[in-house]
């Protein structure tokens, strides 16, 4: 049996944030959510999150993470003290305990699985993950023989100069025999510079401790400040881009683009510079995104172009051109072969196949039929000051430039709206509707004379 415990009680003072450190976002998910996800494939019998600082906020964020048990550490007095809080909830548990840190979000699932497998095959009391760092400053040093058997872990601040020359470091990730660990946890001492209970001290209290060195030190990067958060974001983004380039996606300037792990792409997608995808974006074959575009939970069909535009929580069909400078807002559904042009905003609307909204328009709370042509400057006036109302435009209809459709209003099929019209009443199929003031022309108008007389 396996239990997984994640240490998530710390304040994260160096982040200088009102948000708990483990809830800081990284590529669309919080740090602690990424840590929990990395152990998902192990299918542990127990999953425990040790909380402390802003415990209620952390628990609220993770309340939908099924089967997660919350254990309070109050006050926070070191990693050993944190794991001591498991003595009661894991009383009688028989198996291994995997201890992860809530601020180490880059650990791969494969590495965790290998650590557990190594621990089980070695039959050690504890197996810890280690990394060789070019600059090990601040990390505890691991001292082990050629067979991987660990004799000691010494925190950086407690190391002598000679001991600090060792660059094999403790990653703070352990797989314990829980029964053996439970026996020695009460023996931990605060006799160190910090006056805290170190989990690392259990290594000297247990009979057999082994280490497994991680192949990529980036995996065990911890996050204590904004710089380290940015560095981890860069590592994770590079992983995501590398994965999708291997799957056939072209990034014209990879370093200028960001993704979330929930994105998916079809074949021959091209992503131009300064384009960002967030949330669960679904991008079909032969799409071209950017430059300078933002997509957030967007679903795009095949052969779609999005140039210098924003698409949020919306669906776009096949063979659609969007932009430049268009804003497709939530709950919008754009059908096949549509054109959404420059400086167009669409909100909570359905645009049926073949329709065009080419210039300078606002379409909100509307239903457009197939092959509608919306003239430049057309506005659906959907808000009466209290409620939003629906505009319906039937298939084949055309609105002239600078038209205002005051909702609620229904425009029938194959209707023509004259330029500059304000439409407040329903227009039947096949009609021409004009609703504008009569033009007044005064010939021989001398503006200077008129100004002097006024």
Curated annotation (Swiss-Prot):
BP GO terms, sorted: cell morphogenesis; cell wall organization; lipid A biosynthetic process; peptidoglycan biosynthetic process; regulation of cell shape; UDP-N-acetylglucosamine biosynthetic process
Subcellular location: Cytoplasm
Cofactor: Mg(2+)
Positions with a binding annotation for acetyl-CoA: 376, 419, 436
Record field: catalytic activity: alpha-D-glucosamine 1-phosphate + acetyl-CoA = N-acetyl-alpha-D-glucosamine 1-phosphate + CoA + H(+); N-acetyl-alpha-D-glucosamine 1-phosphate + UTP + H(+) = UDP-N-acetyl-alpha-D-glucosamine + diphosphate
Described purpose of this protein according to its UniProt entry: Catalyzes the last two sequential reactions in the de novo biosynthetic pathway for UDP-N-acetylglucosamine (UDP-GlcNAc). The C-terminal domain catalyzes the transfer of acetyl group from acetyl coenzyme A to glucosamine-1-phosphate (GlcN-1-P) to produce N-acetylglucosamine-1-phosphate (GlcNAc-1-P), which is converted into UDP-GlcNAc by the transfer of uridine 5-monophosphate (from uridine 5-triphosphate), a reaction catalyzed by the N-terminal domain.
Gene3D superfamilies, alphabetized: Hexapeptide repeat proteins, Spore Coat Polysaccharide Biosynthesis Protein SpsA, Chain A
HAMAP family named in the record: GlmU (MF_01631)
Positions bound to Mg(2+): 103, 224
Protein name per Swiss-Prot or TrEMBL: Bifunctional protein GlmU
Top-rank EC class of the record's enzyme: transferase
Keywords: Acyltransferase, Cell shape, Cell wall biogenesis/degradation, Cytoplasm, Magnesium, Metal-binding, Multifunctional enzyme, Nucleotidyltransferase, Peptidoglycan synthesis, Repeat, Transferase
Similarity section: In the N-terminal section; belongs to the N-acetylglucosamine-1-phosphate uridyltransferase family.
MF term (GO), any: glucosamine-1-phosphate N-acetyltransferase activity
Span list, region Pyrophosphorylase: 1-226
Natural source organism: Synechococcus sp. (strain CC9311)
Positions bound to UDP-N-acetyl-alpha-D-glucosamine: 7-10, 21, 73, 78-79, 140, 155, 170, 224, 329, 347, 362, 373
Oligomeric and partner information: Homotrimer.
Protein's UniProt keywords contain ATP-binding: no
GO cellular component: carboxysome; cytoplasm; membrane
Gene name, Swiss-Prot/TrEMBL: glmU
Record text on cofactor binding: Binds 1 Mg(2+) ion per subunit.
Enzyme active site: 359
Species classification: Bacteria, Bacillati, Cyanobacteriota, Cyanophyceae, Synechococcales
EC number(s) from the headed UniProt entry: 2.7.7.23, 2.3.1.157
Ranges for region N-acetyltransferase: 248-454
Pathway: Nucleotide-sugar biosynthesis; UDP-N-acetyl-alpha-D-glucosamine biosynthesis; N-acetyl-alpha-D-glucosamine 1-phosphate from alpha-D-glucosamine 6-phosphate (route II): step 2/2; Nucleotide-sugar biosynthesis; UDP-N-acetyl-alpha-D-glucosamine biosynthesis; UDP-N-acetyl-alpha-D-glucosamine from N-acetyl-alpha-D-glucosamine 1-phosphate: step 1/1; Bacterial outer membrane biogenesis; LPS lipid A biosynthesis
